[in-house]
């Protein structure tokens, strides 16, 4: 699908024009104090190239973004104040923060912008219309967002982590303003097209995370494209149970056992399960780890990571791969005693990349794990900023925030 991109907008000229940018600044916070501390600024860093290009070209930049999932309107704990400060540091300039989304403060600040200024709106999800299922409500918010950049304004979609959402600042505003894919979104789509097009083989997929139900679509889609799919994380126990093995107190989706049995029967030559598990008697960082066979987890233990034998086996498989997609940790990597599986496979993927493989880390917890475990990001071909969006794309689903960018350009303005 052909879409207009940031280069097209810059070629048209943005000096003196208002440009609304939907960024993904949904970073994790460590709540040590009212404003919180950013523990992983990766998404902020990824948003900088598009914003810097617009600033340098003299645009009046208005940024919309969300943080967390506010339940009942504004929540001080989910204010974008720490994000504004961190973004300003990375851009090397002051970033204004509006105290509202499209209220009087946002309007006044937007009207007062000069060329090269950056205004960050307060958490877009503080306005319930952003995520409304009612088309009219979302469109009403989108019109107010468009008003912030005026009749000559433009919209740049650069929040790949939200393009699978049909939301006011992602989808509806693009129906009102001339729309362009930002640098990040364009790069993400190009990478995912490589995973679904003429992929170099062998093609290995590594899937972790807690629930089979979250990954069912991508397993079914990629099982016909990949040469092997490694299953780890909490969801591996439902697959082990489907083989008739005891999984002790491990996470188990009982309602998915039959589905896993069907997948194992259908894709017996593709799916790869752990041969051993690192287990403990409780879910805690100080729990004593025990390595047990994957087909005989004791009743009083729960699996919290894949074992060293599994890491060795999967490392050998990955060492021969030419293309690798990884989404989801292999265990509870936040607990050091149960991080070896995730770290081992991450290192194996990085080693394969060093030998010429094309590797993609599919965002979310996988990207956080890479950073938390101290593995250089340069060891991978691409680290995505959007876990859910990546998975839905690979499932073959339409992404509303991408689909709308392929539509004919409106004339601009909020009308």
From Swiss-Prot:
Molecular functions per Gene Ontology: ADP binding; ATP binding; phosphoglycerate kinase activity
GO terms for cellular component: cytosol
Keyword DNA repair among record annotations: no
Name of the gene this protein is made from: pgk
Protein name: Phosphoglycerate kinase
Enzyme class, UniProt record, top EC level: transferase
Residues that coordinate or bind ATP: 215, 303, 334, 363-366
Pfam families assigned to the protein according to its UniProt record, in alphabetical order: PGK
Binding site residues for substrate: 24-26, 43, 66-69, 125, 165
UniProt-listed PANTHER family: PHOSPHOGLYCERATE KINASE (PTHR11406), PHOSPHOGLYCERATE KINASE 1, CHLOROPLASTIC-RELATED (PTHR11406:SF23)
Keyword Cytoplasm recorded: yes
GO biological process, alphabetically ordered: gluconeogenesis; glycolytic process
Lineage: Bacteria, Bacillati, Actinomycetota, Actinomycetes, Mycobacteriales
Cell compartments where the protein resides: Cytoplasm
InterPro entries, alphabetized: Phosphoglycerate_kinase, Phosphoglycerate_kinase_CS, Phosphoglycerate_kinase_N, Phosphoglycerate_kinase_sf
Keywords (A to Z) from UniProt: ATP-binding, Cytoplasm, Glycolysis, Kinase, Nucleotide-binding, Transferase
Native organism: Mycobacterium avium (strain 104)
Reactions accelerated catalytically: (2R)-3-phosphoglycerate + ATP = (2R)-3-phospho-glyceroyl phosphate + ADP
EC nos: 2.7.2.3
Quaternary assembly: Monomer.
Family named by the database record: Belongs to the phosphoglycerate kinase family.
Domain of life: Bacteria
